[in-house]
Amino acid sequence: MAGFGLPNFGQLTEAFKKAQEIQQNAQALQDELDGMEIEGKSSDGRASVWLSGNQQPLRVRLDPALLQEGQQASETATLEALQAAYEQSTATMKGRMEELTGGLNLNLPGMGG
């Protein structure tokens, strides 16, 4: 069947092995991200939000003095901290995914690899 532009059996077997390896590594990465605690802080440092590496909210801490300033100040600081935690969590997740799939070269003729 090589005349139809299909990869040979050896290449296909290797591709399946790599796919299985990626799947196993992806599960390990998922577990690793679940176990992470990524902190984001407001610009003044008086509000902190922690997310997992999978962006699940874990906890919030607000400085008592911030609460004395009222609802608007507390909401603004909390939002800043949440945005910072989200950006860090997203960057961490993206970086770890690139490490997982980086260097992936299936090299399959006729399959765009």
Swiss-Prot record:
Subcellular location: Cytoplasm, Nucleoid
Domain of life: Bacteria
Keyword Phosphoprotein annotated: no
Gene Ontology MF: a single term: DNA binding
One CC-aspect GO term: bacterial nucleoid
Pfam families (UniProt xref): YbaB_DNA_bd (PF02575)
Keywords: Cytoplasm, DNA-binding
Similarity section: Belongs to the YbaB/EbfC family.
Entries under PANTHER family matching the protein: NUCLEOID-ASSOCIATED PROTEIN YBAB
Record note on quaternary structure: Homodimer.
Protein task: Binds to DNA and alters its conformation. May be involved in regulation of gene expression, nucleoid organization and DNA protection.
HAMAP family: DNA_YbaB_EbfC
Name the record gives this protein: Nucleoid-associated protein Syncc9605_0027
Taxonomy of the source species: Bacteria, Bacillati, Cyanobacteriota, Cyanophyceae, Synechococcales
